[in-house]
Amino acid sequence: MSVRPFESPPPYRPDEFKPNHYAPSNDMYGGEMHVRPMLSQPAYSFYPEDEILHFYKWTSPPGVIRILSMLIIVMCIAIFACVASTLAWDRGYGTGLFGGSLNYPYSGFGYGGGYGGGYGGYGYGYGGYTDPRAAKGFLLAMAAFCFIASLVIFVTSVIRSGMSRTRRYYLIVIIVSAILGIMVFIATIVYIMGVNPTAQASGSMYGSQIYMICNQFYTPGGTGLYVDQYLYHYCVVDPQEAIAIVLGFMIIVAFALIIFFAVKTRRKMDRYDKSNILWDKEHIYDEQPPNVEEWVKNVSAGTQDMPPPPSDYAERVDSPMAYSSNGKVNGKRSYPESFYKSTPLVPEVAQEIPLTLSVDDFRQPRYSSNGNLETPSKRAPTKGKAGKGKRTDPDHYETDYTTGGESCEELEEDWVREYPPITSDQQRQLYKRNFDAGLQEYKSLQAELDDVNKELSRLDKELDDYREESEEYMAAADEYNRLKQVKGSADYKSKRNYCKQLKSKLSHIKRMVGDYDRRKP
């Protein structure tokens, strides 16, 4: 069943609003309205974002970060396996296992056992030549760091820790990913130079000797000679070494994607309210549709012992009607008391089907047992972070629809009596002056209301970044509570209602002028 309150209009979306431009006479206004058409001014507080961000899904930005961190873990393990499988050939160089086997007839310089004993000198004694063992060690070290960092990111995201749901956490992820990505890039380049000696031999003092030794493995004519396995693995890039190089670049790309999605997550957290972000999946729907017949029987049986609804029930029902303190709707008459007191089924429905409500109902204001609206406020901490409750209701937002169908019609009738259809250009000019004056007043009043709501939203986000024991938290909480009192005052509510009346008046005048312009020949 639909959970939208009865007679509730559809939600207003600023991006779907199409203004109804009217074309005034050029001889009267000089074409000014053609150049600057009057557009609706969407208010920050009256048009909240209705989009819900499901950050618990694997396809969401945090979910993609979890997937990428898991892939980095797998690629780091693969790099360990590939690089470790080639370390045995490097140990042979240092111990001189192949001795005179390198003393080929065409070498002419007696490389022999001297190469085996002086292999390490290439990397440290002469400079400009990368030791393969040092390059592999560097890549293994960076793979270990990436493995640990990715494991931490994955674990903190999967266990749904509170730290992983803050903007500061994703800022740390961005910084760590950038550092590790740069270091892995350097390690991969060094590894390429280390496992491919001919790539770094040009311009070095041992370039000609290395080319002479390794040339036999690059030409088909040398296949008949005795092939030393240690020298072969030194001169030729093994398949597992090539795989390690490719995995190194893939890790760099993965870290770049993590940075992108972490920045995207931070932007969404800054743009949307916390109540619009779902970090955990809400199981709010039953496995099977409810039995309607049993539900009706339970409701009918429960009406005997149900206490009568409180007198302020009209203020507690989540409907699009704004009730004033004197029981009127925006200065007009409201429904009679018998309308909502004669049927006790509405409170019973609220008690019987709490599990079939949609996600939007969990974002509605809560009510206490005595029927009063509970307005959350910031308070001094009692037991550290454990005593801090999650603010799930965006109480500093209101929707523009606060009048029911009957009250809107009555209000429209008043504007029709005050501003009847235009019959002459003089009357149109008078309407235009009233429209301009009302528009300026509406913008000024709307800006005043928006300042309060924007400040509430800013303080709400700042309080999550402060420790509850700090002085900054206490000062921000006091200011938050003060603004909540200002917003709950009668002066603020009267300004809000007057602002909505002004908007209705301006819309009516605009429609009258547009109708007159369309009727003109």
Curated annotation (Swiss-Prot):
**Record-annotated OCEL domain positions:** 413-521
Where, subcellularly, is it found? Answer: Cell membrane; Cell junction, Tight junction
Residues in domain MARVEL?
60-267
- Entry membrane topology: Multi-pass membrane protein
Which Cys-Cys disulphide bridges does the record give?
C214-C235
| Composition bias, Polar residues | 366-375
Q: Which residues lie on this side of the membrane: Cytoplasmic?
A: 1-66, 159-168, 264-521
Q: Where is this region: Disordered?
A: 1-20, 300-329, 361-405
**Tissue expression notes:** Localized at tight junctions of both epithelial and endothelial cells. Highly expressed in the testis, kidney, lung, liver and brain. Not detected in skeletal muscle, spleen and heart.
What does the record give as the function of this protein? Answer: May play a role in the formation and regulation of the tight junction (TJ) paracellular permeability barrier.
What does the record say about domains? The C-terminal is cytoplasmic and is important for interaction with ZO-1. Necessary for the tight junction localization. Involved in the regulation of the permeability barrier function of the tight junction.
This protein is called Occludin
Q: What is the lineage of its organism?
A: Eukaryota, Metazoa, Chordata, Craniata, Vertebrata
Its encoding gene is what? Answer: Ocln
